[in-house]
């Protein structure tokens, strides 16, 4: 789940 959250954050940034 950690990598998934990171991906979402990267998309927003």
Curated annotation (Swiss-Prot):
- Name-wise, this protein is Temporin-AV
Name residues in a coiled coil.
none
Localization per record: Secreted
Q: Which keywords annotate this record?
A: Amidation, Amphibian defense peptide, Antibiotic, Antimicrobial, Secreted
Lineage in the entry?
Eukaryota, Metazoa, Chordata, Craniata, Vertebrata
UniProt lists the family membership as follows: Belongs to the frog skin active peptide (FSAP) family. Temporin subfamily.
Output the superkingdom of the source species: Eukaryota
Question: What is any one GO biological process for this UniProt entry?
Answer: defense response to bacterium
User: Residue positions of the PTM Leucine amide?
Assistant: 13
Major subcellular location class: secreted
Kindly indicate whether the keyword Secreted belongs to this entry: yes
What organism is this sequence from?
A: Rana arvalis
Q: Which GO terms describe its cellular component?
A: extracellular region
């Amino acid at each position: 789940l950690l990598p998934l959250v990171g991906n979402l954050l990267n998309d927003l940034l």
